[in-house]
Amino acid sequence: MTRISRCLITSLAAAMLFATSWIIAPAAIAQSLPVDAFYGHYQGSGVAENSDSLYFGVTVRDLDVKIGAEGAGFYVEWTSVIRGGGDPNNPDIRRRTQRMDFTAGAAANVFNAVGRQDPRTDGLAWAQVHDQTLSVHVMQITAAGGYVIQTYNRTLEGTGMRLKFINVANGEPQREVDARLVKVGN
């Protein structure tokens, strides 16, 4: 190998190493947001799909989410207004509100749901923060001995958050909701 070839290869290798350090370094030092970064009032809408959506269509959901301090922890309260079924010109409307309170768990960025620690009754629930996403997981054991896991991933983006909800029963995806919400208050 000539001296010029070796210099060229060495220079290219150094340039590639420098370039990849700019890509890898920020990811390596990125830390999860503190839970209070998610505090606020968010509103928006999304679309729910399930395995029958191809034949029966999707349902539209209006969403209202509040996240704030509660004692030594925090709470997440969400309301879903579901429009679907019935007459397409005048669909059935269902409104569902849930609230969970969380306290710090043993591991960093993991939180236990207050009073939701038995999957046979009210469900086993916990929350975690990873990067810019606050995830709430709820697991329940069904009467037939199966299980259902619901995951609500709330990712902060720009002026609000993206919600990705996934409902899995016995390992099979049942429903997904993809929504965008705007922060409307603190």
Where do the PLM segments sit?
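Bacterial N-terminal signal peptides that target proteins for export
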Residues: M1-A15
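C-terminal segment of classical bacterial N-terminal signal peptides
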Residues: L17-A27
